[in-house]
C-alpha cells in the first residue's frame, strides 16, 4: 500500500487542477490570440505564476483502494492486484474470467 502522504499529495494536486483549470485555459487561449511578442511574454509569465501542481501534467493515476501508482486500470480506477481480487470475488459487474 502506498504511503498515506503520497495519496494525500495526489488528492491535493487533483483539487488544484480543478481549481485553476478555467484560469489556465483562459490564459492559454489569450496567449494564442495575442498579437505582439511582449503581450505573449506577459501572459506567459502570468501562466508561470500559477501553482506548479495546478498543471494536469503533474497528476498521476493511483489505485482508489491501495494508492498504487503502477498497474493502473483506468476503466475501474484500480491497480491490477485489487482488480484481480475483486473480479474473483464477483465484486465487478460484467467482468468474467476469459475462456476460449
Swiss-Prot record:
Transmembrane segments: none annotated. Keywords: Chloroplast, Plastid, Ribonucleoprotein, Ribosomal protein, RNA-binding, rRNA-binding. GO terms for molecular function: rRNA binding; structural constituent of ribosome. InterPro entries: Ribosomal_uS14, Ribosomal_uS14_bac/plastid, Ribosomal_uS14_CS. It comes from the Eukaryota. PANTHER family: 30S RIBOSOMAL PROTEIN S14, SMALL RIBOSOMAL SUBUNIT PROTEIN US14M. Belongs to the universal ribosomal protein uS14 family. Part of the 30S ribosomal subunit. This is Small ribosomal subunit protein uS14c. The gene is rps14.
Amino acid at each position: 500500500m502506498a504511503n498515506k502522504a503520497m495519496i494525500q499529495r495526489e488528492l491535493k494536486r487533483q483539487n488544484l487542477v480543478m481549481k485553476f483549470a478555467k484560469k489556465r485555459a483562459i490564459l492559454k487561449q489569450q496567449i494564442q490570440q495575442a498579437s505582439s511578442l511582449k503581450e505573449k511574454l506577459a501572459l506567459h509569465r502570468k501562466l508561470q505564476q500559477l501553482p506548479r501542481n495546478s498543471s494536469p501534467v503533474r497528476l498521476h493515476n493511483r489505485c482508489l483502494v491501495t494508492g498504487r501508482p503502477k498497474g493502473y486500470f483506468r476503466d475501474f480506477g484500480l491497480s491490477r492486484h485489487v482488480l484481480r481480487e475483486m473480479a474473483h470475488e464477483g465484486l465487478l459487474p460484467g467482468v468474467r474470467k476469459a475462456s476460449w
